[in-house]
Amino acid sequence: MKGVVAPSANRFGHVSPTSAAHVSADLGEYLDAHGDLILDGGDCQVGVESTIVLATGSQPVILRPGAVTAADIKRITGVEVSEETTNAPRVSGALDSHYSPTAQVILITAVSQSTFESKAGFLALAQTPTPTGLVRLASPETIEDFAHELYGSLRAGDDLKLKTIYVVPPSGDGLAQAINDRLQRAAF
């Protein structure tokens, strides 16, 4: 059995691109120097990268969570899928530190109990109020919106030269789990 491999259109460890403009910002000089082009098919629909499943053993294992969950796979195929339990990275994006902007990402659970630096960004679901003095990078209404806007928001923080981005991670399973996986790595 052979796997499928495709390169990411960003520099290793950096925030993943979700638009052609992001690819150009990361790789434009390299592409221009080699006469390569960027094919713009519009912004990514989901935002966070795909689910990666290892299907070589008797039970498939999710190596990287994404929009497709273990429950989705079981519902469609009837096959039980487990989640990776080892800390050893086996796939892209599984290092402790990955998807990282230049700004420091700090995960917080409660806005009212936090002290914030000035000139910092903020990302949370829309119903969470923006603390005074912070720059709201996005106001996603749903978990799906959060996933779609996550990387663009982290890149916007870098574009604004923010030193810190405070994030209130969404709670829940499924896509929220994938978002939290990416946020944990960005904050490492």
PLM regions: where:
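Active-site-adjacent structural elements in enzyme catalytic cores
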Residues: M1-F188
